[in-house]
Amino acid sequence: MEFTGNRVRQLFLEYFEQKGHTIVASSSLVPHNDPTLLFSNAGMNQFKDVFLGFEKRPYLRATTSQKCVRAGGKHNDLDTVGRTARHHTFFEMLGNFSFGDYFKKDAIRYAWEFLTDVCGLPKDKLYATVYLDDDEAFALWRDMIGLPEARILRLGEKDNFWAMGDTGPCGPCSEILIDRGEHLRCKAEECAIGKCDCDRWLEIWNLVFMQYNRDENGTMTPLPRPSIDTGMGLERVTSVLQKVGSNYDTDLLRPLIAFVEQLCGQVYHRDDRGFPFRVIADHIRSCTFLITDGVLPSNEGRGYVLRRILRRAVRFGKVLGIDKPFMYEIVPVVVELMGEAYPDIREKQDFVCKVIKIEEERFHETLHDGMRIAADMVAKVKQEGGNVLPGKQAFTLYDTYGFPLDLAEDIAEENGLTVDKDGFQQAMEAQRERARAARQDTAYGAGMELWAELLQQLGPTVFTGYGRTSGESVVKAIVAGATRVTEAGAGTAVQVVLAETPFYAESGGQIGDSGLLRAGDAVVRVEDTKKMAGGLHVHFGVVAEGVFKEGDQVVAEVESARRLAIARHHSATHLMHKALKEVLGEHVNQAGSLVTPDRLRFDFSHFSPLTRDEWNRIEAAVNRAVFQALPVEVFETSIDEAKAMGATALFGEKYGDRVRVVRMGNYSMELCGGTHLDNTSQVGLCKLLSESGIGAGLRRIEAVTGEAALAYLNEQEETVRMLAEKLKVPAAEVTNRVDSLQAQLREKEREMEQLLSRLAKYQIDDLLAGKEEINGVTVLAAKVQAPDMDALRSMSDLLKEKLGSGVLILGAVAGDKVNLVAAATKDIVGRGVHAGNLVKEAAKVCGGGGGGRPDMAQAGGKDPSRLSDALEAAKKLLKSQIK
């Protein structure tokens, strides 16, 4: 039988299905309702509440192949990936589980039977470990399985006792290991199970016997219904069955390495030289599955871990000479290998590729500068005789150039240095403290401490503004500057708290109301309303007339025309959200919004600019809902009922047990606390103004409605009229006239290119006269005239053809930058010459970077004055390359 990775997974699930287990699909890598976990990292994660007794399932036996990621948090294998034969950030955990059904006897029997009868592993090579005092498990291995006592080892709590946490279910475990042979023996004096961790003794399967409950005092009492939790790494067991020395040599990972070989034009080696290949092969699996499960690159949380993984892989791609986005090209290989078992990665393949490519492009923008800065930092440390890169410098790389700490550590390690992690963390905390201090400033008048005190004294403000825009109330507090006062006269800037108010306080992206507060002869002109300390509606304004006093009876009047304009834009925002999902896909989620009387701004998850067709379809969908005059219904219900009805809950928002639902016909339904229209027809018209990228995987749309939309159309009409006047054509002919002018410009540019090409040919004869010979190889290294990289490459091709055999190193100044090209003929590449390394060496001198293939490469620099030095540096390296 051929044991492909997919076949092993299938055999495992089918075997346990035959033993009465229900095959349960892998849970998402993003744990559901478990804030203690960054990612799913074991098969039992999705059954945690079942083991704890909080959840009932319709089965007592289950089997899974669980997607797992261990990178970040308590379980972090990132640093060891690629260095060992068996560590990964992404892996699959095969597992079988019993929830109070069978226990040790069947768990051990099933595992042994699967490994020996189904997989055919040699019984005389298998070992078992048990917990020190687990006599029951020891006896089962010896008497039921027939394993010699010499191959059953008792180990301590560190190796053979498992606990879900400091308290709760726990119990001993039993591991199954295989002896892979004397040839893999390590150099330790005593190479044995429990004594070393070498590749000879490979742990295959861990059987956890949950039989105790540990309380706060550490006392363990037997569970009434003991359970089983087992885990076996698919990659590990497949490596054993395929008789290969490393997980990376299995058919689960080797095709990924082969594809990287094609990308970089280098051959993979199983020793340290293959380290970058293994990192990339592992990391592309993590990236593919994390993005499929909804994780997007960001600067915090899960998104930051994803960004670290992806950027680390890109960095090792550069080590292999890949100086362009490439990770996204490997995604289809992952899908081909794993799409049958995990169809969702096939469904989201295009989406995943887009996310990865965009993130790669963003990283490349900063990587060149960052690598140069990092090299300078390392050189300075070495020059001063040090061996530690200061934490502040590592933080600069992180904060300014987007280098994760582990990337700085990799760079340092390659240069024989370490990173001051404590200093890095101190710099990070200092930045956080600055951010906290900034949040605590008094931009809103009084400091947060005063608002917290007032909230405690007065209680939260009652908001009455959903159904009306005016109402009577009582002044509960007046603040001027940062001090509570009892009264304030004309001209004084104040912040006023009322017992109840119709003024909406800024929240959920909707800005606060403005209007008037009238108390007899005193008037406060309210310019803004904000929610402070989580419960106070604070009216920011100026006393326009009279003396305003605490305890006054007031009439609060919201500026109703402004409120209506805000409501137009807020209701249109809901329609926009729905339209984006319809046109672009369900991956679209709101990431932020701003609703003002003048316009709306909507941030959403998407990974490419809108096409003109998408733009038009989104705008049409919004206006279709407007013209359909859909009723806007607002009601309160429970959070569970709202979700059951299909209401959209915004990611990252916190909701109580009771929520407010805004429904617009059968088109849109969202949880929202803002103010809205009564009917979508009141929007009038919606026009999109702009769409742009604001971050990795985030886009922003701005739009206007109602009177603002009319004003926008009038402006556009006036612009067209002025253009028509300047171009001396009717308005309807403006685009045709512009097309004609552009065509004329392109023709002039083409003529210019032809002229430059002829000039280049004249240069070639002069350049060839300057060729020289180095170690028997014809070499032409020269400064040339070429306006851009395309022209320089064209010149290189012509010169290479003329040379027949040899090496070219050309440099040209283009504005304030330097373009560099290196090329070598096939026969010279065979003598050890690598154009990519030559051009990289030259670029360093000019303050730039680049690289490429052995036969052709290009680079750029920032210092034209160093071009001659750069060419000499490349020639010097060339001398050492030629064999």
Swiss-Prot record:
Its main location: cytoplasm. Gene3D superfamilies: 2.40.30.130, 3.10.310.40, 3.30.54.20, 6.10.250.550, Bira Bifunctional Protein, Domain 2, Threonyl-trna Synthetase, Chain A, domain 2. Its cofactor is Zn(2+). Signal peptide: none annotated. GO terms for biological process: alanyl-tRNA aminoacylation. Its EC number is 6.1.1.7. The keyword Ligase applies. One of its GO terms (molecular function) is aminoacyl-tRNA deacylase activity. Catalyzes the attachment of alanine to tRNA(Ala) in a two-step reaction: alanine is first activated by ATP to form Ala-AMP and then transferred to the acceptor end of tRNA(Ala). Also edits incorrectly charged Ser-tRNA(Ala) and Gly-tRNA(Ala) via its editing domain. Belongs to the class-II aminoacyl-tRNA synthetase family. This is Alanine--tRNA ligase. It comes from Heliobacterium modesticaldum (strain ATCC 51547 / Ice1). The gene is alaS.
